[in-house]
């Protein structure tokens, strides 16, 4: 049995197509190499995005204006109504509890005043609207804002 070495490896017969050698003699891909006679396409490839005499697409589209503030803080919102559905008996609700109700693992939370408070909540969130704080405090609860 012969020892197999890397330089002995060959692809299976018929699995690889032979490279077409253009411009070698007067066969099918000889002389003009299948490019026809004269013209731009016979001489050099046309660059991507070139549209002939027409204004190219990338020049007809307006440039982006303004800027994006990378320090902007995005808040996930939760309403009092949804909070009451998740915790009907009220009690202490932490920021992590609120995040699990929203269905996110990270980020900031803002409490909004949509809905009515019927039970006492001691809630901790990153931010809360003034109306939401008023509704919870009127039901003898407290709102702690982290930010």
Curated annotation (Swiss-Prot):
Pfam families: Ribosomal_L27A (PF00828). Residues 21-49 are annotated as: Disordered. GO terms for cellular component: cytosolic large ribosomal subunit. The keyword Cell membrane does not apply. Keywords: Ribonucleoprotein, Ribosomal protein, RNA-binding, rRNA-binding. One of its GO terms (molecular function) is rRNA binding. InterPro entries: Ribosomal_uL15 (IPR030878), Ribosomal_uL15/eL18 (IPR021131), Ribosomal_uL15/eL18_sf (IPR036227), Ribosomal_uL15_bac-type (IPR005749). It comes from the Bacteria. GO terms for biological process: translation. The keyword Ribonucleoprotein applies. Belongs to the universal ribosomal protein uL15 family. Part of the 50S ribosomal subunit. PANTHER family: 50S RIBOSOMAL PROTEIN L15, LARGE RIBOSOMAL SUBUNIT PROTEIN UL15M. Binds to the 23S rRNA. This is Large ribosomal subunit protein uL15.
């Amino acid at each position: 049995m012969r020892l197999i070495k890397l330089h002995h490896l060959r692809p299976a017969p018929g699995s690889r197509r032979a490279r077409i050698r253009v411009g070698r003699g007067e066969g099918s891909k000889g002389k003009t190499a299948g490019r026809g006679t004269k013209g731009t396409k016979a001489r050099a490839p046309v660059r991507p995005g070139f549209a002939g005499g027409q204004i190219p697409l990338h020049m007809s589209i307006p440039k982006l204006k303004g800027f994006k503030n990378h320090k902007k803080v995005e808040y996930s919102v939760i309403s009092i109504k949804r909070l009451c559905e998740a915790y009907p008996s009220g009690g202490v609700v932490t920021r992590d509890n609120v995040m699990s109700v929203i269905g996110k693992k990270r980020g900031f939370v803002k409490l909004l005043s949509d809905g009515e408070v019927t039970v006492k909540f001691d809630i901790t969130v990153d931010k809360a609207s003034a109306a939401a704080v008023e509704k919870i405090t009127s039901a003898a609860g407290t709102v702690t804002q982290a930010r």
